[in-house]
């Protein structure tokens, strides 16, 4: 018992040892299944598997670190160090980092002062110093301290963004509203969390509170969906703002050009931008990296030029007292200018969302030693120019450029604006993919643009949707001042979401002192709420459009999550009883035809109700049935060796298995159906061999234990689903399995159950080889994909809002989303579908 207890404790804590004791493929003992399901009707089948696995675990020996497993088996996985990169590779990654991560924040000098002084006109030098001081400290506090020094460390195995934070919390506390998370998911190597301290006592109360409170779970999900909707809205505003501010420089170089012409040129650039998006980051990364490097050097150089020409008195702005003077002199106008001031930190959230496969340390060093100094010099130079030209308040950046360098800088600025827009679009794609993987966004076609590096994706529907939205926004507003206010709304929405989620990570995972956490929350949330009050005051100027846009996106995601949750819970309640399968016998009340049937469903436990419809509809069923559930777990990558989790649904003579194919939200699913079938069959063979090996070890160890385990292996899971299921059709065949012997695939004869205690070692090996041969023959006969298309409808007595949401909105989304099987490219000749409607 002591040994068993120690195994349980090791399984319950976060693994830090390189050697483990666990099975990934195993046959579970279901002796306690009925009792467990009575106590926990919504738990997955692996709740029993976890306990039995712990009783049977053996030490597997030294095992390579889980993150190294990801890197070895899946190209592009995040590594925790840069030691394996050559100097040349580091230089390449540094340039790509500039192009991917810093494009948005790097173009903020194009419009920050212009938008600020549109709200608060310049009346004297102190106004310039006050505005500059606001910009400097906003950049230092939000971009540097909050994001670069703190938020970047909250990445999920290298993945950043709102949903990465949510995924990190879900892995440490069961707060997901979709009840399909299994204890076995915690045994995925990349599921393990790294925390500063091995002691979890301080975070235990928070974890229990989050897991026990349905209200907190809903609030957390709504907060994440709200932040995600703002990220997508940001994907619309950023290209419009960046491109228009860059093209607007033409009004300085060509005084006669009109605003309508600027708008049309901006639209043309936007069309080009979104047209090349499909080529991926890696294909243009080497080009945009050097371009951004030249841009930052130009920005710093222009700043130094202006400081030398107009004086260095602007360095006084590092004294925060000028912020006080600024508000004292301008009061309301200074407060309204806060919305424009925030634009200097736009792109801070994109730095986190675009973290991707770059290391945190490299991003931090690049920002501190290149990006931040160039930005500070750029703003100081513009302020120095304004000190001598108080009447200039529009297009400040382009007016501050030396006349001889205007057109080269204009060209570089336009390129930088396009790169910044592209980076935000890429972040939007990544965010949508993460939300789709966690069941919060309708499935869409996702194209992976790189074979070597993961995370580089392209979503055609979203790409063209963003293009149309950007064009409409540019044509409707036609001014960077109005777009700038909308930009501030979306950026602050994402920032505040991160500010609220990060303290949960700090307390739950990092286990930081609560005083430090509360100080972080109060300071940054208070700061961002102050900025938010400023941008909301000007919402009547047209910025309300972006709020409506974000609200529509939020409703789409919430309705999809709500409908998916109802559908899953209904399928769990109406699943087939195992007693019924026992009564039907080994032939399932019909004829077993040669071949393998892969029945896709969303259940992680139990027999799906749609299987009964196949039995009643089809004259025969395949000799081998595998219930396949493609399940996304909240980790970036699931190693290929841990992709499939198998168990038997019935005794061996039934030839029915359950397979859960687990994918992370960064996993690349580009395999064709032949590759998927091959991987699945190989994994099934490994499962059967390990099962036989386990039985053999038990037989050699203790005859009494052997008999008990063998007896329990024939017992099956009986789940109290609360529904009565009947085929209501005459049985096509009714065979008594106990009176049959082994026969060929496709015949109506079956297997007589044989206990392990009655078999010699050679008989056991013969039984194993026979079953493997059975699988090979079934595979040669063909694999058919059995798809149950389940729809949900609200009951007639449901309240009106529920009928509207389920019968119309959710039905519309489900009808137009991409089917999950489409990723496998299954030919129609291998496909069989049955529809079923659930009343909820």
Where in the sequence are the language-model features?
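The structured alpha-helical core of multi-pass membrane proteins
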Residues: 2-840
């Amino acid at each position: 018992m002591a040994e068993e207890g120690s195994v349980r404790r090791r399984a319950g804590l976060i693994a830090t040892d390189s050697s483990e004791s666990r099975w990934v493929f195993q046959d579970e003992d279901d002796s306690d299944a009925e009792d467990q399901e009575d106590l926990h009707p919504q738990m997955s089948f692996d709740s029993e598997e976890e306990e039995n696995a712990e009783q049977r675990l053996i030490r597997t020996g030294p095992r390579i670190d889980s993150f190294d497993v990801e890197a070895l088996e899946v190209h592009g996985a995040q590594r925790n160090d840069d030691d394996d990169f050559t100097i040349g590779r580091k230089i390449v990654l540094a340039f790509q980092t500039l192009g991917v991560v810093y494009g948005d924040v790097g173009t903020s000098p194009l419009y920050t002062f212009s938008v600020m002084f549109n709200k608060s006109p310049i009346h004297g030098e102190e106004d310039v110093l006050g505005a500059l001081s606001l910009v400097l400290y906003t950049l230092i506090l939000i971009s540097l301290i909050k994001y670069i020094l703190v938020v970047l460390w909250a990445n999920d195995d290298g993945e950043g963004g709102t949903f990465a934070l949510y995924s990190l919390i879900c892995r440490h506390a069961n707060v997901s509203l979709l009840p399909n998370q299994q204890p076995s998911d915690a045994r995925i190597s990349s599921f393990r969390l790294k925390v500063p301290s091995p002691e979890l006592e301080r975070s235990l109360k928070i974890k229990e509170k989050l897991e026990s409170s349905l209200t907190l779970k809903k609030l957390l999900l709504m907060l994440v969906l709200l932040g995600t909707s703002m990220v997508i809205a940001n994907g619309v505003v950023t290209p419009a703002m960046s491109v228009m501010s860059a093209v607007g420089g033409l009004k300085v170089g060509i005084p006669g050009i009109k605003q309508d012409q600027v708008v049309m040129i901006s639209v043309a650039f936007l069309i080009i931008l979104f047209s090349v998006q499909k080529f991926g980051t890696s294909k243009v990364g080497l080009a945009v990296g050097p371009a951004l490097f030249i841009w930052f050097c130009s920005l710093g150089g222009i700043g130094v030029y202006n400081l030398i020409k107009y004086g260095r008195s602007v360095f006084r702005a590092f004294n925060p007292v000028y912020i006080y003077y600024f508000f004292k002199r301008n009061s309301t106008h200074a407060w309204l200018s806060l919305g424009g001031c925030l634009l200097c930190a736009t792109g801070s959230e994109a730095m986190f969302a675009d973290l991707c496969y770059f290391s945190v340390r490299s991003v931090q060093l690049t920002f501190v030693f290149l990006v931040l100094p160039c930005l500070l010099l750029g703003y100081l130079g513009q302020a120095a120019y304004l000190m001598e030209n108080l009447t200039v308040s529009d297009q400040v950046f382009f007016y501050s450029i030396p006349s001889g360098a205007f057109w080269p800088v204009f060209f570089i600025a336009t390129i930088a604006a396009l790169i910044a827009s592209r980076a935000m679009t890429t972040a939007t794609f990544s965010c949508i993919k993460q939300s789709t993987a966690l069941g919060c966004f309708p499935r869409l076609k996702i194209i992976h643009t790189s074979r070597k590096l993961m995370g580089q994706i392209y979503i055609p529907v979203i790409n063209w949707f963003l293009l149309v939205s950007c064009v409409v926004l540019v044509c409707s507003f036609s001014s960077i001042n109005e777009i700038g206010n909308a930009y501030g709304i979306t950026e602050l929405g994402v920032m505040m979401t991160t500010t609220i989620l990060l303290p949960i990570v700090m307390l739950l995972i990092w286990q930081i002192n609560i005083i430090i956490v509360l100080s972080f929350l109060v300071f940054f949330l208070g700061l961002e709420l102050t900025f938010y009050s400023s941008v909301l005051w000007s919402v009547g100027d047209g910025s309300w459009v972006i709020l409506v846009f974000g609200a529509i996106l939020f409703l789409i995601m919430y309705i999809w999550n709500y409908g998916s949750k109802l559908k899953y819970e209904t399928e769990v309640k109406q699943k087939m009883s195992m007693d019924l399968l026992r009564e039907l016998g080994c032939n399932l009340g019909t004829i077993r035809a040669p071949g393998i049937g892969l029945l896709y469903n969303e259940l992680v436990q139990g027999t799906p109700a749609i299987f009964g419809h196949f039995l009643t509809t089809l004259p025969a069923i395949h000799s081998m049935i595998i219930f396949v559930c493609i399940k996304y777990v909240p980790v970036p990558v699931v190693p290929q060796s841990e992709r499939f989790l198998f168990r038997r649904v019935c005794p061996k003579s039934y030839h029915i298995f359950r397979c859960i194919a687990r994918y992370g939200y960064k996993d690349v699913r580009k395999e064709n159906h032949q590759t998927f079938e091959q991987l699945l069959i190989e994994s099934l063979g490994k499962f059967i061999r390990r099962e036989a090996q386990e039985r053999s070890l038990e037989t050699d160890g203790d005859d009494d234990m052997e008999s008990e385990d063998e007896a329990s292996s024939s017992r099956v899971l009986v789940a109290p689903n609360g529904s009565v299921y009947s085929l209501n059709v005459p049985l096509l065949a009714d065979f008594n399995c106990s009176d049959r012997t082994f026969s060929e695939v496709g015949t109506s004869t079956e297997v007589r159950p044989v206990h392990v205690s009655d078999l010699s070692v050679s008989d056991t090996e013969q039984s194993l080889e026979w079953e493997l041969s059975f699988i090979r023959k079934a595979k040669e006969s063909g694999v058919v994909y059995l798809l149950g298309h389940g729809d949900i409808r609200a009951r007639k007595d449901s309240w009106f809002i529920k009928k509207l949401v389920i019968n119309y909105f959710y039905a519309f989304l489900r009808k137009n989303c991409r089917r999950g099987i489409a990723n496998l490219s299954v030919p129609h000749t291998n496909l069989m579908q049955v529809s079923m409607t659930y009343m909820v």
